[in-house]
Amino acid sequence: MAAPGARSCNLSGLLPAQTSLEYALLDAVTQEEKDGLVYQYLQKVDGWEQDLLVPEFPEGLEWLNTEEPISVYKDLCGKVVILDFFTYCCINCIHLLPDLHALEHTYSDKDGLLIVGVHSAKFPNEKVLDNIRSAVLRYNITHPVVNDADASLWQELEVSCWPTLIILGPRGNMLFSLIGEGHKEKLFLYTSIALKYYKDRGQIRANKIGIKLYKDSLPPSPLLFPGKITVDHVSNRLVIADTGHHRILVVWKNGQIQYSIGGPNPGRKDGIFSESSFNSPQGVAIMNNIIYVADTENHLIRKIDLEAEMVSTVAGIGIQGTDKEGGAKGDEQPISSPWDVVFGRSGPEVQRDNILWIAMAGTHQIWALLLDCGRLPKKNELKKGTCLRFAGSGNEENRNNAYPHKAGFAQPSGLSLASEGPWSCLFVADSESSTVRTVSLKDGAVKHLVGGERDPMNLFAFGDVDGVGINARLQHPLGVTWDQKRNLLYVADSYNHKIKVVDPKTKNCTTLAGTGNASNMIGSSFTDSTFNEPGGLCIGENGQLLYVADTNNHQIKVLDLETKTVSVFPVFRSENAVVDGPCLAGKPKTLPKLPKSAPGIRLAPVAASPGQTLQFKLRLDLPSGTKLTEGASSCWFLSAEGNEWLLQGQIPSGEIESISNQPTISLQIPGDCLSLEAILSISVFLYYCSSDSSACMMKGILFSQPLQITDTQQDCIPPVELKYIF
């Protein structure tokens, strides 16, 4: 609650005074004049008889990046505080983060500034703390964040828009509000003068706030929030946008990395592979050893030449653009948060792809980059390199229209092309309207396929309902891929943690895989397996395998559309060090986890005395027509939870290099036994592929060996055979 004697604690109380200030700032010419006007404004609001105070953070709210919950009137006393009301799906909120990062780089809590993110969810999925934590990691948010799941602060302060910034003085008194994105100059002006004003009065405290970043406790991970994935149908490769590591991976179908380009830190540099950098790349498309990348947070389209091993920029200028028409040469054309890319042709008479279609999430439009001369529907001939809007007015809407420039999208985030008749369209995952839409390649007409509702202004028609057309419900879908073999569209229904399938002929939308729960389990079927905000997907060249970027699980999952099974796609370095798996170079410091679907076998008890050696012989059989994945470290390791003395504090482990010559595992019972009974766990991870390497899997099994420790010396103990057929 607000402190006693406070005035009405909502933003309307600030409006008259701040509006007068902003009109005055329009007429100010010099920086000195602007500084003076803000200083005078602060004298005015600071002299009000009653402060316009924010309420205290309610008890019981969940916090991230802090050692303990924060109090406005205890911890933040003596600070200039910026409350950032945001929701992590919102592209405008994402656009604001670089401004906040820059402000934090300029002023620290020792200078008297603290930013607090107040997460006020739009979608139900965004109310879950683990999902917010993943977003905090994805977007490198390093200030405290509170999960206001019930939007209590939002409602009490009468916030109406994402994002909204509220700047507080050192008494919790509201000073300014900024609504929407694009106010960097005002944000810095208001903050710097507020710090000066209150420092002049001795009201700023230099105490540190207990910050504890979750990212500091993350274990190393080969993939970090992979966003998008595509198949190179010519060279038997996959291209993965390893978004959280700010890099692009090119991997063979067995999972071996061929190229790692960029990372691990964000940057914006062209040049040779070892020097180039990206910033949260998303969409990828490959053709003839050329990869195009939606370099999202750099607001660029990048080109990777695998033969020359060079990265260059083909669209964007490196800062967020506001132009909603375009038409300039690509590297001179400002663009805004491109999220996905896909190749296409400017007409049926064109023999090869000459257009790169772009889901321009930042301006809620579909754009085109001309890779060669050509024309768009209802356009004159365009020069090579031209980058321009194709569909979408730029208004954030769910508006369908026969005229592409009058249609409206809401953060389009996924694209797929069906060039053949009768479809001849782009499929669009329009995330904020929770719909899938189509854009005609003949005339640009934008039509509804599934999800959402008829009111173009209602962006809150979401849910998880299988159905036809408007009766189907999605929740923030981020990816689509067209299955030409079956004439079906697969959808990454991200916030429902599902993969759905749409028949565009009937508009029927049904669940293909996932339970709706955010977790990481490989089940016995599609609907027993789980995902966590899958962000992208692509279909393999023969239509058998569906690759899914399971973003918050930091994995690529593979759905076999014929056998209806799910597996994890292994990713490993060419020097035989596994990157995506439990068996890393050297002995692991912590126990890797078996897949939840891994079967468990309890063995018959074995009696042994101190000093005796037990032997376990692996006898594993692979499915017919498969082989161990070359270069991937299939392995075993031992554990004894609750009886670590049995292993003398170690985690014995080893590799499985051949199915025909499997290892024997030896364990000597220590001389000093702390228990007469124990259970030894033998965990096994196997990476194997089909003979043609078209599908690769990681499987696991757990053998549990009960042990009875006795003082009586046992006769020679026969080896225990560990048999299993995968």
Swiss-Prot record:
Any one annotated GO CC term: cytosol
Subunit record text: Monomer.
Protein encoded by which gene: NHLRC2
CDD domains from the UniProt entry: NHL-2_like, TlpA_like_DipZ_like
Organism field: Bos taurus (Bovine)
Functional note: Required for normal embryonic development.
Matching PROSITE patterns: NHL
Subcellular location: Cytoplasm, Cytosol
Listed name of the protein: NHL repeat-containing protein 2
NHL repeat start-end pairs: 212-254, 265-307, 335-369, 409-439, 461-505, 518-562
Pfam families from the UniProt entry: NHL, Thioredoxin_8
Highest taxon listed in the record's lineage: Eukaryota
InterPro entries reported for this sequence: 6-blade_b-propeller_TolB-like, LDLR_classB_rpt, NHL2_NHL_rpt_dom, NHL_repeat, Thioredoxin-like_fold, Thioredoxin-like_sf
SMART domains, alphabetized: LY
Cell division is among the record's keywords: no
Major subcellular site: cytoplasm
Keywords on record: Cytoplasm, Repeat
